[in-house]
Amino acid sequence: MATIKDVAKLAGVSTTTVSHVINKTRFVAEDTSKAVWDAIQQLNYSPSAVARSLKVNTTKSIGMIITTSEAPYFAEIVLAVEEHCYQQGYSLFLCNTQNEPEKIQNHLDMLIKKRVDGVLVMCSEYTRDSLELFNGTNIPMVVMDWGKADDHSDRILDNSFEGGYLATQHLIENGHKDIGVIAGHLSKTLSKERYEGFLKAMHEANLPVRQEWIYEGDFEPESGFEQMNNLLRLEKLPTAIFCFSDTIALGAISALSEKGLSVPSYMSIIGYDNIHSSRFYSPPLTTIHQSKSRLGVKALNILLERIKIDKTQYQPQTIEFHPELVLRRSVRNLNK
């Protein structure tokens, strides 16, 4: 197996020059650089990733901790992050918590041992103790979406409160006064903020919030299906339902369809996230748009910026994205 000394000898340069060419740590004349790369190719030399990381203090790797990569919302973000990592010459370690808080500790320990250059966090389960452990390593972290505030981490906020308000306001503007909710767990920041936006819009319109129309679950189609069936057992029903994710909306629409009830003529449905498949629902889903690819790319760019600069001079920043209403055909206008 060829060594760096073999490459240096064939190229007629020092091993230090070979190292600078490979790691791009110093300017090397074009002819010299070409001679080095020709020697590398001829000898089929593959530098040790571990040795290179120790030499230049980087592993060219990023860790990403998320709730689950199976959900369409997360999957679209992961795809954008992974593609951008590839374009920037980084590899990605993807860690799923599956809503299990204890998993984050193991993931953090693993990422520290892997000597990742930085970490993206997109889950609500991490604890203050976990953050303090990680902050002690000086590894940069960007908290995406609904994570807890931290003095050492950058944050990207999606303004779920604003999105909840927009969704409810749209239903009200279309003449709906009896509005229900199928949410995720309201103890979670994401659901709590969307619910608070819902409450604000309802209170501004002087509309009552009926607790028997408020259902909690998770962000899966099965939850939307189950909670819609529970709702349909009531004597008095709302004319519209605000589902806290498009996947919840899919389950809710399916439950109505199984009973021969159509959307939106029988009941209007509005979703949240604008996942790729939502436009292909039957009917196409009116929803709240979040730019998943933009969120992922922005988070990674901030992290890469932090990796490259002096950590003692960096001030953590907070970036906000604002949701938008996407009009399709799942909300009936009762004003007509």
From Swiss-Prot:
It comes from the Bacteria. GO terms for molecular function: DNA-binding transcription factor activity; transcription cis-regulatory region binding. Residues 4-23, 48-56 bind DNA. Keywords: DNA-binding, Purine biosynthesis, Repressor, Transcription, Transcription regulation. Hypoxanthine binds at residues 73, 188, 219, 273. Residues 2-56 form the HTH lacI-type domain. The keyword Transcription regulation applies. Pathway: Purine metabolism; purine nucleotide biosynthesis [regulation]. Transmembrane segments: none annotated. It holds the Pfam family LacI. CDD domains: HTH_LacI, PBP1_PurR. One of its GO terms (biological process) is negative regulation of DNA-templated transcription. Homodimer. Is the main repressor of the genes involved in the de novo synthesis of purine nucleotides, regulating purB, purC, purEK, purF, purHD, purL, purMN and guaBA expression. PurR is allosterically activated to bind its cognate DNA by binding the purine corepressors, hypoxanthine or guanine, thereby effecting transcription repression. HAMAP family: HTH_type_PurR. Consists of two structural and functional domains: an N-terminal DNA-binding domain, approximately the first 60 residues, and a larger C-terminal domain, approximately 280 residues, which imparts the function of corepressor binding and oligomerization. This is HTH-type transcriptional repressor PurR. It comes from Actinobacillus pleuropneumoniae serotype 5b (strain L20). The gene is purR.
